[in-house]
Amino acid sequence: MGEIFKRTVPDVPLAWTGERLTNSAGPQVEIEHLHRYFVARTLCRGLDVLDIACGEGYGSAFLAQTARSVVGVDVDQATVAHASATYAEPNLRFLEGDARRIPLPDGCVDAVVSFETIEHLYEHDAFLAEVRRVLRPGGRFVVSSPERDVYSPTGAASNPYHVRELTRA
């Protein structure tokens, strides 16, 4: 884990949609995202991994440094095209797809990684059912979501793209 990872900055920046890390998100957000992928990379070493809502692809590429294989899935076609063109590795591919209807067969991955995704979905049950469907028995689910009480202490969502924020309770 001694190697340094540098996120590739696209020549033409992806537009801020509230649903992926871009250059306009700020350094604190980038540090938090990279930290999550550092943890996931340790947990996913040598495994077949699905990165749901992979965004511009930097995290999937980072996971691919130690995973057997990585599939990054994102709902936005332009983002998938960017990821495919920017992060080309033999054990890494990107697909367009929805977190509630993952375009992969049953039981095809050892680990599912999904960071800052569930709060963008109304259908949490459908998302979690899809994670279960694509995981092999005994698989790992590495997930994070901003805690509403920390990121939105007034109770109102601080990000208009968060449709169902979570709390500890």
Language-model regions, residue ranges each:
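Short, glycine-/aromatic-enriched active-site segment of Class I SAM-dependent methyltransferases
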Residues: 143-162
